[in-house]
Regions:
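Structural helix-adjacent loops and short alpha-helical linkers that scaffold large soluble proteins
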Residues: 41-55, 102-110
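Extended glycan-interaction surfaces of carbohydrate-active proteins
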Residues: 1-30, 59-110
Length: 110
């Protein structure tokens, strides 16, 4: 949610409550934002954008097949290894990835 080049970049959601609150929107990745980005990207690039969005989904698909199978965390560290934090099974994260998958299916039939 903030560029790694920013002086306020805090990629890890760790520490006590105050530190976590400070880091909350300053570096961790929020999976629920992927749908808006991916759908806008596909509207601009259409079929030529499919391969990029499929590659973008690869990490999410891998994450959904580990630990709590079929789900995603609320947020992830902004730097590798992208450790999950917050809600373990966060519906908006899962719904967002499913929405992107469904949008990609529409492009397959065209």
């Amino acid at each position: 949610t903030i560029s790694p080049k920013s002086g306020g970049y805090r990629p890890e959601y760790i520490g006590g409550q105050l530190e976590r609150d400070r880091n909350f929107h300053n570096g961790p990745v929020w999976p629920w934002t992927i749908a808006a980005y991916a759908i806008a990207y596909l509207k601009v690039y259409q079929h030529s954008g499919e391969s990029f969005i499929r590659r973008l989904l690869t990490g999410y698909e891998a994450e959904m097949s580990e630990l709590c199978i079929g789900t995603l965390n609320e947020l992830y560290d902004g730097n590798p290894p992208f450790k999950g934090h917050g809600g373990m099974s966060y519906a908006p994260s899962v719904a967002s990835v499913i929405e992107v998958c469904n949008t990609l299916k529409k492009y397959e039939t065209k």
